[in-house]
Design a protein with these regions (language model features):
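Core beta-strand elements of the Rossmann-like FAD/NAD(P) dinucleotide-binding domain
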Residues: 2-4, 124-132, 249-258, 295
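Gly/Ala-rich phosphate-binding loop of Rossmann-like dinucleotide-binding domains
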Residues: 19, 23, 183, 187-188
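Beta1/beta-strand and adjacent pyrophosphate-binding region of the FAD-binding site
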Residues: 1-12, 166-173
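FAD-site-proximal beta/loop scaffold in flavoenzymes
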Residues: 150-167, 253-327
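Flexible, glycine-rich terminal cap/loop adjacent to redox cofactors
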Residues: 7-14, 18-35, 40, 47, ...
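N-terminal Rossmann-fold NAD(P) dinucleotide-binding loop
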Residues: 15, 179-180
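Glycine-rich flavin
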Residues: 2-3, 20-27, 32-166, 194, ...
Length: 448
């Protein structure tokens, strides 16, 4: 039996980043992974999707070249080459992770993990015991429990990332982050895209004003989006798939060559034997406290598996919090201030409270908004669609930032830093920004 200071189950961002930090702090770590290191994000999520987003953005640029004085632009999308580049990007980054965890303080075990007792885990035919255990097993794509969900051509996001040709017609069930990103990508690649969303608006957890504007923008790009659409079944229809749904009391149907199920994710807890060791969990994930500790002492859960926030960077920082708790280290992490991004065209970036959040919590607030059409850099880029909205308390303290437009995912980080520090609108107004830059949009909103 191997004895170590810390066992980490899962080598995604929440697992391998925590393992590296623990090793740097002098702990011995057993890191267990049943698949490829890097987790969903690197192998079948954030990274491969962003590689495709880059190609889609280039296609969009070529299509608009004449507006910039570049005429007679002809190009052909070589989809196999696009996918090969995607695989190369993933491999490069995965090789980097493999190199990082080749650390004398980290013992990598490849195999399915299961608890023997609270502090003993078995994997790859070997038992490991430790003082503390961190579960970082991530999540898997959910499927609607409807007839036809197992038909050929009904895909998860992982499966869609491995297709060998662009579908002529693509139906996406779910208008969350995953659904809208794939809608943008495959629309740019030439697919006829229809998105069906059960809620009243796309991106249900984002600022509702922003979500509406994004939906309208995607519609102008040829993406058909139906909200308040309850998908009932999927059936074979000729060479395609008929997706039946109900919208406002009317039965409707859309035919597609491929159907993407983008209806959320579920925590990977099935094979761990959690019930046997008394860890409390539900379909939403493993229950944890503010230090990411479960109800069983010395057993922690970070990332998607606890269901708090299914984002790679949230997993990383939850891992830091868990390790700090294990080692008795005080930290100043603000795990309530987690930015999020949607890599559509245009992008979305957000952090903190929305207007709806403030109303629900009874918080008096002020909303300030500046538009990219008045930003010099955005006009030069020809990307003027969108705005930055700041949410502030009546005392000026910054509570939220919501950006829809070029490079929104990057721009929101400034507001994230300010909110984390507890800074105010006045503090933001006093920060000098370079001109002309997109970042001026954030300060412009502060002055509105």
């Amino acid at each position: 039996m191997l004895t170590t200071d810390l066992i980490i189950i899962g080598a995604g961002p929440g697992g391998y980043e925590t393992a590296l930090l623990a090793a740097r702090r002098g702990l011995s770590v057993a890191l267990i992974e049943r698949g490829e290191v890097g987790g969903t994000c690197l192998n079948e999520g954030c990274i491969p999707t962003k590689a495709l987003c880059r190609t889609a953005a280039m296609v969009s640029d070529f299509a608009e070249a004449e507006a910039f004085g570049i005429k007679d632009v002809a190009f052909t999308l070589d989809f196999p080459a696009v996918m090969e580049r995607k695989r190369a990007v993933v491999k490069q980054l995965r090789d980097g992770v493999e190199s990082l965890i080749s650390n004398p303080n980290i013992h990598l075990l490849r195999g399915e993990a299961r608890f023997v007792d609270a502090l003993t885990v078995e994997a790859a035919g070997e038992r490991v015991t430790a003082k503390d255990v961190i579960i970082a097993t991530g999540s898997s794509s959910a499927m609607l429990p409807i007839d036809g969900n197992t038909l050929e051509g009904v895909l998860t996001s992982r499966e869609l990332l491995d297709i060998d040709s662009v579908p002529q017609r693509l139906c996406i069930v779910g208008a969350g982050v995953i659904g809208l990103e794939f809608a943008s990508v495959f629309s740019a690649f030439g697919s006829e895209v229809t998105v069906l969303e059960y809620a009243k608006e796309v991106l249900p957890h984002f600022d509702s004003d922003l979500a509406k504007r994004l939906r309208q923008s995607l519609g102008k790009r040829g993406i058909k989006i139906e909200t308040q659409a309850a998908v009932k079944s999927i059936a074979k229809e000729g060479d395609g798939l008929a997706v039946a749904y109900e919208r406002k009391g009317k039965e409707q149907s859309v035919t597609a060559d491929k159907v993407l199920m983008a209806v959320g994710r579920r925590a990977n807890v099935g094979t761990l034997n959690l019930a046997d060791i008394g860890v409390e969990f539900s379909p939403r994930g493993i229950a944890v406290d503010g230090n990411m500790q479960t109800n069983v002492p010395h057993v922690y859960a970070v990332g998607d598996v606890n269901g708090l926030m299914m984002l790679a960077h949230a997993a990383t920082f939850q891992g830091i919090r868990a390790l700090d708790a294990i080692m008795g280290v005080d930290d100043n992490l603000r795990l309530d201030v987690i930015p999020a991004a949607v890599f559509t065209m245009p992008e979305v970036g957000m952090v903190g409270l929305t207007e709806d959040d403030c109303k629900a919590q009874g918080i008096e607030y002020v909303a300030k908004k500046a538009f990219f059409r008045a930003n010099g850099k955005a006009v030069c880029l020809g990307e003027t669609d969108g705005y930055c909205k700041l949410i502030a308390a009546v005392d000026g303290r910054l509570l939220g930032c919501h950006i829809y437009g070029p490079h929104a995912a990057d721009l929101v980080q400034e507001a994230c830093a300010l909110i984390t520090r507890g800074d105010s609108i006045a503090d933001l107004q006093g920060i000098v920004h370079s001109h002309p830059t997109l970042s001026e949009i954030v300060q412009s909103a502060a002055h509105c």
